[in-house]
Amino acid sequence: VRQLLDSKQAWAGRMWYRIPQEKPFLLSAPELRMLLPGWEGPNGCLATDHITVLGKPVGWCYRERPDGQYPDSGWRFFSGEEDDAYVNDVSHVGVYDLNTICNYDPDIIPLLSAPFGTAYARGEDGKFHAEPFEAPEGP
């Protein structure tokens, strides 16, 4: 994930805005609805293929303070089933618009205004609960 964030190509190339077509995404562009019409601020985020390709719900997410150079909201979304090797392979992580990930899992919408430095895990009850969070270290 850190490698993707540090890649000027990903952000500068505006990958966060368009949907790459090389992966078999669960949802196609015409299926996406506008779920965040009043969102203000940067709307880029990271999500794994567990969510966008396999269709698993978000199980864990966190918001870190972005460097401000790109339209990054700071949100990172995972199913919670990924291991370190999976997440560290940038081919399994993509840069997306927050609205896109909300289409995959609308349950995250109430979390999006949380401050930087927060994390949430989905409990056995199916609801998100705040978790302690330590920002990942740089490259």
Go through the PLM ranges and name each one.
Residues 1-54, 58, 62-139:
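Acidic, proline/glycine-rich low-complexity IDRs
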